[in-house]
Amino acid sequence: MQQCHFKRYAKPRKPQDLLNHNCINVRYSDTSGLYAREFEKDAQKFSLKVKGQYIANSTIHQLDAALDGLGIAYIPEYVADGYIKSGKLIAVLTEWCPYFDGYHIYYPHRRQDSPAFMAFLQVLRDRYNNGIR
């Protein structure tokens, strides 16, 4: 979320506070409903549906909308990290972020892997090993 939003509205301290904010929703093509945001803290896990005037269908569209000041987005930390460090976005509810144990790629190990495939794996390692909790 952009800093200007929090000049008018209090920064959310708990997930339920999002119900008083304009949030950027997402609807992925494989589902008909809006995605419920997932939260986790200590042993408490739950999902929360929020309201907002903007609905995106991808993470990049959510990011663009947040950068344009359209609301609070729910996007992966590794996507937002550079914008947070530059001050273009503000992270909220970080203590409620669910643990993400990373991506997993499964492929046959008995065949000869091409240099292109090995380069692809290295790009994924370089990109996603930084900043993911």
Predicted regions and their residues:
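Hydrophobic hinge/microswitch elements
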Residues: 46-91, 98, 113
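C-terminal effector-binding regulatory domain of bacterial HTH transcription factors
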Residues: 77-86, 96-133
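Short loop segments at secondary-structure junctions
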Residues: 3-5, 29, 42-44, 109-111, ...
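Flexible hinge/capping segments at coil-to-helix
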Residues: 1-24, 42
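Residues that scaffold the ATP/ADP-binding catalytic core of kinase and kinase-like folds
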Residues: 8-9, 26, 83, 92
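Secondary-structure junction motif
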Residues: 24-43
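Alpha-helical segments flanking ligand/cofactor-binding loops in enzyme cores
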Residues: 16, 63-64, 118
